[in-house]
Design a protein with these regions (language model features):
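Bacterial N-terminal signal peptides that target proteins for export
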Residues: 1-8
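C-terminal motif of bacterial Sec signal peptides marking the signal peptidase cleavage site
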Residues: 13-16
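Bacterial signal peptide processing site
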Residues: 18-21
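Extracellular mucin-like PTS domains
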Residues: 23-56
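A surface/extracellular/periplasmic glyco- and lipid-processing/surface-interacting theme
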Residues: 55-101, 108-367
């Protein structure tokens, strides 16, 4: 039984061993690695630098009275005129180097007085302040200025100021209604110790509701730039006599300015300790007489400032001889050359030297 079972099993095994070998599975070919497609190169967007907004060009303005470059808010503001003492004990005075225009003219008793006119530059110290006179009031009227003074003679206070205040000038009298703008110093004796400042005067002017601005176009003279250095003379001088000493000027070609002297000594401004300097010196001859109605003991000068007369204009180291003309009390004194053309002044401080007809003024200057 057992034998019969083994034979078939062997046969099966033999048959299984003699069959054909199985076909091997094909080995897959290795596929080449895919080539990476390069990413497209993107050109960088150019960065535009932010454009800076240019700073606005400052507005150029020129002061009405002296033609100097100035802050537009100051170039046309109300001028302030202040009467200044020239007694020997009042020297040295304060405020000259801040003034746009300076007047000097004969006064009582053989003395003279100044009037300083301020516009774009402030003066922290002005004085000694003295009383007004009619012709100074009318010069202040040329600019419709605030008029600073310590009282005045009878005619000034009773006739001239009342007829001009609020119309041709704006009264700033230390003795009548504007005293807050003034003070007296202890280092000098009255009446040579009254002082003020442009700031104090403008505060009072504002409180009185005086205008803050000059009437447009009023008081404006023609101006010019400096002559080239090559055209300036190497030296020059001017001498203008007054009762208590001459006013002298020495021309400086380097700065195209006139260095001022009083009685042969350098004129120094007590406010800043610096030499007083002018850019233009104007000499006006006017007929001088004396007021027959002057108070007893006084001889009040009267200057004929309406009409025409002789004028010499010193600028750029040279002199132009011509005439002055003023139509009425509130009109600007105009300056004309020999051909009748209005004379242009150099930008900067103007000194106006008023003398009596016949006064001998000497100078060294081409012209």
């Amino acid at each position: 039984m057992t034998r019969h079972l083994r034979l078939p099993l062997i046969a099966v095994l033999v048959l299984g061993c003699s069959s054909a070998p199985p076909t091997p599975n094909p080995t897959p070919s290795a596929s080449p690695a895919p080539t990476a497609t390069p990413a497209p190169t993107i050109a960088p967007t150019p960065t535009t630098a932010p454009t800076e907004t240019p700073a606005p060009t400052p507005e150029i303005a020129y002061a009405a009275l002296d033609g100097m470059p100035a802050d537009p808010e100051l170039a046309n503001r109300l001028p302030i005129a202040v009467m200044i003492d020239d007694n020997v004990v009042a020297r040295p005075q304060s405020g000259f180097n801040a003034a746009s225009i300076v007047y000097q003219a004969p006064a009582d008793g053989g003395e003279d007085r100044y009037m300083l006119v301020f516009q774009e530059v402030d003066a922290p110290d002005i004085g000694p302040v003295r009383s007004g006179r009619p012709y100074f009031v009318y010069w202040a009227a040329e600019y419709r200025a605030g008029f600073g003074h310590y009282g005045g003679d009878e005619k000034t206070l009773k006739e001239v100021i009342p007829s001009t205040s609020g119309k041709l000038i704006y009264n700033l009298d230390a003795m009548f209604g504007s005293g807050k703008a003034y003070h007296r110093i202890s280092t000098r004796k009255a009446p040579h110790n009254g002082y003020t400042s442009t700031a104090a005067l403008r505060v009072v002017a504002a409180a009185k509701k005086y205008p803050a601005q000059l009437v447009d176009g009023l008081g404006v003279r023609p101006f010019k730039d400096d002559a080239p250095a090559s055209e300036r003379p190497v030296k020059g001088s001017i001498n203008v006599p007054y009762g208590r000493g001459a006013s002298g000027y020495t021309y400086d070609p380097a700065t195209n300015s006139y260095l001022r002297s009083v009685s042969g000594k350098p004129h120094v401004d007590a406010a800043d300790g610096k030499r007083v300097v002018a850019r233009n010196v104007i000499v006006l001859w006017m007929r001088l007489s004396y007021d027959p109605e002057s108070e007893p003991g006084h001889r009040r000068p009267v200057l004929d400032q309406i009409g025409t007369g002789t004028a010499w204009v010193f600028r750029d180291g040279t002199v132009i001889k011509g005439t002055w003309a003023k139509k009425d009390s509130g009109d600007l004194t105009r300056l004309y050359d020999g051909a009748g053309k209005e004379i242009s002044l150099v930008r900067g401080r103007i000194f106006i030297q008023v003398v009596a007809t016949g006064t001998k003024v000497t100078y060294d200057a081409p012209g």
